[in-house]
Regions:
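Non-catalytic, membrane-anchoring transmembrane segments at the edges
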Residues: 1-505
């Protein structure tokens, strides 16, 4: 998208840090967010040390979590934070009054509907949302929690156990939460600003102090005769994540601003450079845009870990895992050799939410419906829909290519390495092509971008996918005919044997 004119930024949040914003030349809402997250990090350490389950009961822990979370929301978003509180209140009323058989439907419609109305108002009423505080992030996290909890209550109270999948059975909630539990789950200071989202049962186990035992029992510590487990320290995990956060911040300030995504649709840049160099810049600019997401999600993960939330048992080497609610795996994203591998490691908790409320429950067209829900949840910028609609055929084509050709490259290590290099390069190119409209936001620059790229991935999918589908169909027909011929031959030889058997009798 073209660079926005220099217009003073308006915020509904606190202006106490405005001098710091001017000094750093960083928008005030971003300064408020960063300072509040750093405050939350310190508060989380204090919460873990002085309000641990051994020192304070669940009620006290719930109250402190909720009150600090509300204060942070008001500081960052001012009166816009009312939208968060209204959605939580509305959906709590629905949860308490709705019939169990419909609780998930009503909650889903109410939460997604309210989120969508707020996003429409930001984009189309308040000047594309670029000159006002963005409160949609926390609202998106709250929407995930509201809808996932509603489905989990429906699973636990309205469905038979044998009708549930393994994950649904594990996460099913057998009683409606109290008002305090509900508010604490949605408004706690560990995750109100940047999430990540978490499952209700995991959060309640953390508040009540059962989360360590549950995870270590899952890792079979009972086999060693343990009945009580030590409280693992998150310091190492938090330190590692803060180092990553700082590196991402350095990358963002030093690299990202020098490779703006909007340059991909600059008329002069398009006219003066070849397709190859435009493709190279596309890859560089998209990769340069990732650290801001890495920064926000890794910092959010560190905040939760500092409070003691996020412990996920032990790995195969016996090391502590603090990735229960981690939202990304940077190494796996950057080295992904398939579109699926990247999706599985990017915005992980949102992917789990989409699977829980849509993909695993949709009777038909689960992939398309999941992408549509993802686009709707992200917002109403046209670029989001270009991204997710484009992702559908590319995903289907990638699956078809993998199923048709991967087995040819598994016969030797050299071929496998060659296959991995080719699939890594093609995956990164495809991802850059897919996500650029997401970053450009608007329709006009998106169409200009597609034209500058000659719609090459769209055309490639349109040509390759039908051919591979026909090839698969022909192979299935060939195998079916081969099996039928084999069956007929065996039957032909069986007749004389049967007749000979009758004569011998």
């Amino acid at each position: 998208m073209a660079e926005q004119p220099s217009i003073p930024f308006r915020t509904t949040g606190s202006r106490v840090l405005h001098p710091l914003s001017v000094f750093l030349n960083v928008p005030l809402d971003q300064v408020n967010f960063a300072v509040c997250q750093l405050f939350a990090l310190l508060a989380a350490f204090g919460f873990r040390l002085y309000l641990s389950p051994s020192r304070a009961g669940p009620v006290v822990r719930h109250v402190v979590m909720t009150m600090i979370g509300i204060c942070l929301a008001i500081f960052c978003f001012g009166w816009y934070s009312l939208h968060i509180f209204i959605e939580v209140s509305l959906c709590y009323f629905i949860m308490m009054k709705a019939n169990i058989s419909n609780i998930h439907r009503y909650s889903f419609v109410a939460a997604m509907g309210y989120l969508t109305v707020c996003q429409i108002s930001r984009v189309y009423i308040f000047n594309y949302g670029l000159l006002s505080t963005d409160f949609s992030g926390p609202l998106m996290i709250v929407t995930q929690k509201i809808t996932s909890l509603a489905f989990q209550i429906h699973d636990g109270m309205g469905r038979k156990d044998d009708a549930l999948t393994t994950d649904q059975r594990r996460l099913a909630v057998s009683a409606r939460p109290t008002l305090l539990e509900y508010c604490s789950y949605h408004l706690n200071f560990l995750g109100i600003l940047a999430g990540p989202t978490s499952n209700y049962k995991d959060y309640i186990a953390f508040i009540e102090g059962n989360h360590i035992n549950i995870k270590l029992i899952e890792d079979h510590w009972k086999q060693g005769g343990y009945t009580k487990f030590p409280d693992p320290s998150p310091l190492r995990a938090v330190a590692n994540k803060m180092i990553i956060t700082l590196l991402c911040l350095v990358w963002f300030t030093g690299i990202t601003k020098n490779f703006p995504i909007s340059y991909n649709v600059d008329d002069k840049f398009i006219s003066e450079n070849s397709f190859f160099w435009r493709l190279c810049y596309l890859v560089i600019s998209v990769h340069a845009s990732r650290p801001k997401y890495y920064f926000a999600w890794t910092l959010a993960d560190a905040v939760n870990n500092a409070g003691g939330f996020g412990f996920n048992g032990l790995d195969k080497n016996g090391n502590l895992r603090w990735d229960l609610i981690s939202n990304l795996n940077i190494w796996n994203i950057e080295t992904a050799t398939s579109f699926k591998m990247c999706l599985d490691n990017w915005n992980i908790q949102t992917g789990a939410w989409l699977k829980s409320v849509c993909y695993s429950r949709a009777p038909n067209f689960s992939t398309a419906l999941t992408f549509i829900l993802s686009a709707l949840w992200h917002g109403v910028y046209p670029g989001y829909y270009f991204t997710f609609v484009t992702a559908i055929p590319i995903t289907l084509t990638a699956r078809a290519v993998r199923s048709n050709f991967r087995h040819y490259f598994l016969s030797s290590k050299t071929l496998k390495v060659f296959y991995d290099i080719i699939t890594w390069a093609s995956t990164q190119l495809a991802l850059c092509y897919i996500v650029t409209p997401f970053l450009l936001l608007a329709t006009e620059p998106t169409i200009k971008f597609y034209k500058s790229m000659y719609f090459h991935f769209h055309l490639l999918c349109a040509l390759v996918l039908p051919v591979l589908k026909i090839r698969n169909w022909m192979m299935v027909e060939k195998i079916a005919k081969s099996n039928l011929t084999s069956l007929n031959v065996n039957s032909f030889h069986a007749v004389p044997r049967f007749q000979q058997y009758k004569k011998e009798q």
